[in-house]
Amino acid sequence: QHRNPAYYRIYALGEFATLDRLVYPCVERRIVSADEVQGAKLWVGLDFGYVNDPSALVWGYWSEAAHTIYITGEYVKTGMLNDEIAARIIELGLSKEVIIADCAEQKSIAEIKRAGVYRIRPSRKGPDSVVHGIQWINQQRIVIDERCTHTIEEAENYVWKKDRKTGEYINEPEDAYNHCLDAVRYGLQSVAGMDKLRTINKALLG
């Protein structure tokens, strides 16, 4: 009844107790061909890190017609300064694309823009924006190119928090294994109507 059965049970049927442990339970891992993404919209997202957490630049395509998110490339590294991030974006040929980066790092965004990545923009964040973004992504088919090993590792380990009293998973993800996946969520803001999610949810819930 839905591309993501867990999503359908929770948001359409209201069966929140059946929430799967994984935030993204339905992910395909394979080689993505150029033909598949023909005509799809390119997106690029950036999550900042430094010493303990890596900076994660992730990109891919979104096919509105096929309701499919393709994650096709990643660059993940710790200890990167902003000028190094900008240089890598330029080397990868992504500097002319719209890049959506974590809005908590306005200074970093400004420094990367000054280094020649002129279309970098801050992400939009509002109340429950993380969960709303996750919900929208889970309405799509998710395909990760098998060469994106960091993103795959995160998808296999990114889980919902568990209520210690009830033992049930709650509607808030653990803050771990989420650097690449946060970058995906940011990047998709440039091509997808994620802001419309509240309306979609109300329609599903009747």
Outline where the language-model segments fall:
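ATPase catalytic-site recognition across NTP-hydrolyzing enzymes
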Residues: 1-49
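Anionic group-transfer/hydrolysis microenvironments
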Residues: 47-49, 104, 184
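Short, low-complexity Ser/Thr-rich regulatory SLiMs
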Residues: 48, 61-63
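Coil-to-beta-strand transition motifs
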Residues: 50-54, 66
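Short beta-strand scaffold segments in enzyme catalytic cores
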Residues: 55-60, 185
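Mg2+-dependent endonuclease catalytic cores in nucleic-acid-processing enzymes, primarily RNase H-like
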Residues: 58, 65-175, 194-195, 199, ...
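Acidic, Mg2+-coordinating catalytic module of metal-dependent nucleases/exonucleases
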Residues: 175-193
